[in-house]
Amino acid sequence: MLLAIDVGNTNMVFGLYDGDKLRGSFRISTNSERTSDELGMLIAQYYHFHEISCAETTAVVIASVVPPVMYTLINAIRKYLYVQPVIAGRDADIGIENCYANPREVGADRLVNAVSAVRKYGKPLIIVDIGTATTFDAIDENGAYQGGAIFPGLKVAMEALFLKASKLPRVDIERPENAIGKTTVQSMQSGAVRGYVGALTGIITDIQKELGGKARVVATGGMGRMMAEYCDLIDDVDPNLTLEGLRLIYENNREAFENR
């Protein structure tokens, strides 16, 4: 079986594949203070809960945007799953034309998402990954990764408001029924969610124009489903986009993986 791991700024998401079937997934917080044993035992507990032997894992592929946790994660995988993990973009060819001015600057997760989305949804395409940061990625009609935009995540923006404005409270992120808030909390929620939807709409519209026409818009990330309820330009929501991209990269590089 294949274990695909998406290491994000807030969470690590683990997906266990049996062939092309996602057998199960789980997430834990991204914490650079954990030891490799702590991390390894969390992974082993998940396997035990689902009555899966750690020895059944034959390959591990990782996409990460958090370098400080990689040493610990790699050691945990080696010790508890007995596998040498492969890092997407470093050890395995991601398999998409990258038109960034400096291709090394692009986060591996963004390219992995592109591989997955093009396979599933076609092209041209805009991928909106809504998490700690929100990224917009443009795939042209030839399937090439053209670049995109990076925007602060909604939770990050709300936390900054709480920290910098002494009289404003920390609030849950939800959209009140009315644009005109009748309390401070409602006003903050209205401004945050409606303002964020406005930003999504504006950036997607501008990217559509630069791509030269209508491109399908796919949302993913921790807040992708919530924002899709409010943003009419989002066509699809795919929470497993990155995991599925990692699986595809494994399949495309299977021979190299098996010869490691």
Which role does the model predict for each range below?
Residues 38-50, 199, 203-204:
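Short, well-ordered amphipathic alpha-helical segments that serve as non-catalytic structural scaffolds
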Residues 2-6, 61, 125-129, 218:
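Short glycine-aspartate micro-motif
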Residues 2-45, 143-169, 174-178:
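Short glycine-rich, Thr/Ser-proximal phosphate-binding strand/loop in the N-terminal lobe
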Residues 2-4, 30, 157-260:
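ATP-binding/phosphotransfer module of carbohydrate and carboxylate kinases, centering on a glycine-rich
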Residues 95-125, 247-254:
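Conserved phosphate-binding catalytic cores of ATP/NTP-utilizing and phosphoryl-transfer enzymes
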